[in-house]
């Protein structure tokens, strides 16, 4: 059975090599050669990279162009292990070099402004156009800000839901927290992507705290009254961490109105 780490390598083709097989320009892609078909994929994360790989597997002749704005991709899977000090950032860092080279895929590092379905063009932010026969749109997800927590709060209270820049910030905050401090996490209301995610994070943070800051405490302020795999997590927390973790349901004081990250 393939594990999550190997799956990431398989799909994304993790490598430390340079980006010589990738391009930041879309020159020569404004038209499609006669008797050719081109699939343009917007987004080079799990969805886009897997689509590119399997399209090539099923069709050796189709031209595949993958447009991804970032030259490095950090996987959300295993980012909690980085936050808990069990892995380094390089462990979750990937690029598209191997995918491009091994499967003959053109990678364009640019931001997409729009997909012009009427004219079958992907329009880049710089105005360049990439013509397509078929288009796949897989840009991933973004964090949804709620009242009382805005983008301005991220510097002081990073959510680190999207792995990358915020991941080491949260890891450093946890590392610098005094022994006897309190780690507070707000779990979102349904629906949201990866329902077990917040509780996986709490589990790994608890592992770190038990080992390094045993006098500290974790409080989970949940915006709902039950959560995914609750019995499994609750039993594991009790067995491994005793009363280290305090989970508060929305109806019993978990509901959050606003956050003051400066005053904490």
Identify the meaning behind each predicted range.
Residues 29-106, 189-231:
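Beta1-alpha1 glycine-rich phosphate/pyrophosphate-binding loop at the start
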Residues 6-28:
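N-terminal export signals
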Residues 139-212:
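Glycine-rich dinucleotide-binding loop and its adjacent helix/turn
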Residues 1-3:
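N-terminal secretory signal peptides
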Residues 102, 106-114, 122, 130, ...:
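A Rossmann-like FAD-binding core segment of flavoenzymes
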Residues 10, 138-139:
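Short, well-ordered coil/turn residues at beta-beta hairpins
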């Amino acid at each position: 059975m393939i594990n999550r780490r190997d799956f990431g390598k398989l799909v994304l083709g993790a490598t430390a090599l340079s980006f010589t097989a990738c391009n930041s320009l879309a020159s020569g892609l404004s038209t499609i050669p006669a008797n050719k078909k081109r699939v343009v994929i917007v987004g080079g994360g799990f969805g886009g990279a897997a689509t590119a790989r399997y399209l090539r597997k099923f069709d050796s002749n189709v031209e595949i162009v993958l447009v991804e704005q970032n030259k490095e991709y950090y996987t959300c899977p295993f980012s909690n292990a980085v936050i808990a000090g069990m892995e380094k950032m390089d462990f979750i860092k990937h690029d598209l070099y191997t995918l491009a080279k091994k499967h003959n895929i053109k990678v364009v590092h640019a931001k997409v402004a729009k997909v012009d379905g009427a004219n079958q063009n992907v329009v880049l932010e710089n105005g360049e156009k990439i013509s397509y026969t078929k288009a796949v749109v897989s840009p991933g997800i973004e964090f949804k800000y709620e009242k009382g927590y805005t983008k301005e709060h991220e510097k002081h209270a990073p959510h680190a839901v999207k792995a990358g820049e915020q991941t080491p910030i949260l890891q450093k905050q946890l590392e610098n927290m005094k022994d006897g401090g309190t780690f507070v996490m707000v779990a979102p209301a349904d629906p949201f992507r990866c329902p077990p995610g917040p509780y996986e994070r709490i589990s790994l943070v608890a592992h770190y705290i038990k080992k390094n800051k045993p006098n500290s405490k974790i409080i989970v302020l949940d915006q709902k009254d039950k959560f995914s795999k609750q019995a499994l997590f609750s039993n594991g927390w009790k067995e491994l961490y005793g009363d280290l973790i305090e989970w508060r349901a929305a109806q019993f004081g978990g509901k959050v109105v606003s956050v003051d990250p400066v005053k904490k």
